[in-house]
Amino acid sequence: MITSSQNAYQYMWSNDESTEIIWKVGMTISSYGGALGQIFFNYDFQSFKPDYVPATWVLNLYSEQDLRFAANFVTQPTGYPHGLQWPLVAKYFGNESFIAQNMLHICMPKVFRLSEQYLIRAEARANQKNYSGASKDLSDLRRARFQGGNGTISVSEQNWLEIIEEERVRELYMEGFRLQDLKRWHKGFERKPQEQSLTNGSSLKIEADDVRFVWPIPKHELESPGSQIQPNESNK
């Protein structure tokens, strides 16, 4: 059950239960899948050694009133020799029922959630120049995510894409949507050095519609006997 220390959004991620979930991959203690949150924590009951941490620009998208921040991130010292403290991706730390059995980072994938449908319709309405309808969808979603229901927002012809892009990051962070979003919007991205990051790997720029947005065809499929599959641009 939801406790005083958890809001409904946090409970959805810590217990895989919510009226907002349209379809999820069900799991039980005796029948479950992989550990979705492993790479974000690598917790060994002594320390956290994450493979990835969220970028500063993502953290800065959330306001103090946004209930999603506490559900999505938790600041912890890492177990690496440098001992740095950093916000970690918390939404996949694991289902509490599994954690009670010392089974970490196991969550039920939530393939369809109601909030995604609101975001899809908001974008569709904005593309149809129905900015009032798009604003209503975004505001309805945000009121469910902000303390006191204070999430009203308005979009226009000039700002709708920027606002919807930011809201999709806040709501769907690390759920597998970002690549397809950038492809759909014909946008590139740039990785910039972060606080305490290493120089190597801290800078990368991919332009819009770069061929690398499409994964290369696996080599074994190209070279298999009798294969008539042709390489795509990413193979070249």
What spans do the regions from the language model cover?
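Residue-level signal for threonine
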Residues: 54-55, 218
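Aromatic (Trp/Tyr/Phe) and Gly/Pro-enriched flexible surface segments
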Residues: 39-44
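Acidic/polar-rich alpha-helix caps and helix-coil junctions
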Residues: 1-38, 49, 62-236
